[in-house]
């Protein structure tokens, strides 16, 4: 079965009886889409046993696709071809690059960022692009303290995991999808 944001909003919630299902967000970053800033994506994630195992995040404005699958790897596909992805090792001596939501900044988030070891740079982006920049090795940490929906995170989560990264709850446990 597939669960999509728009179908849930319309009251159509499929029964998840097996261990595998799709999470789809055909327009992640609605605020960014309305602002016409290009920071919106199409997200498709496959979840098995509560964990994203494959994902695709597509940014129509730049015709860029990030894909990843457990045990296979992660890639960015754009006009320059295919690039294999790997998260970078955070260098706390040089300072972390933090990427956070452009639309969901809060005093709690700012306090969290202020308490990180050493922040060299803070970037704001919309939608699942934050996951993609982590997988691309352009950022180290994406803190998200405000509520979010599973269709917003599953695809990007799969890409980050396939690139060698982790997605965790604020207490350090793996983020699970139920």
Segments from the language model and where they lie:
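Oxyanion/phosphate-interacting regions
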Residues: 110-116, 131-178
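Short gly/ser/thr-rich secondary-structure transition/capping motifs
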Residues: 2-7, 81, 172-173
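Structural motif
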Residues: 1, 20-22, 54-55, 97, ...
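Flexible, acidic active-site loops/lids enriched in D/E/S/T/G that coordinate Mg2+ and/or position polar
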Residues: 1-49, 56
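Acidic beta-strand-loop-alpha-helix segment within the catalytic core
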Residues: 44-132
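Conserved beta-strand termini and adjacent loop/short-helix elements that scaffold enzyme active sites
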Residues: 5, 101, 124-125, 144, ...
């Amino acid at each position: 079965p597939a669960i999509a944001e728009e179908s849930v909003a319309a009251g159509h919630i499929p029964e998840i009886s097996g261990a595998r299902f799709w999470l789809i967000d055909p327009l992640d970053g609605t605020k960014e889409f309305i602002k016409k800033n290009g920071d919106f994506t199409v997200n498709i994630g496959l979840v098995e046993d509560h964990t994203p195992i494959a994902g695709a995040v597509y940014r129509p404005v730049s015709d860029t696709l990030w894909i990843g699958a457990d045990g296979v790897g992660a890639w960015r596909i754009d006009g320059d071809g295919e690039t294999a992805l790997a998260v970078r090792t955070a260098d706390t001596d040089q300072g972390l690059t933090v990427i956070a939501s452009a639309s969901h900044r809060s005093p709690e988030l700012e306090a969290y960022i202020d308490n990180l070891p050493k922040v060299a740079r803070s970037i704001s982006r919309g939608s699942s692009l934050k996951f993609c920049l982590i997988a691309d090795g352009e950022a180290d940490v994406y803190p998200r303290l405000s509520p979010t929906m599973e269709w917003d995170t599953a695809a990007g989560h799969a890409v980050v995991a396939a690139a060698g990264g982790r997605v965790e709850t604020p207490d350090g446990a793996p983020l699970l999808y139920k």
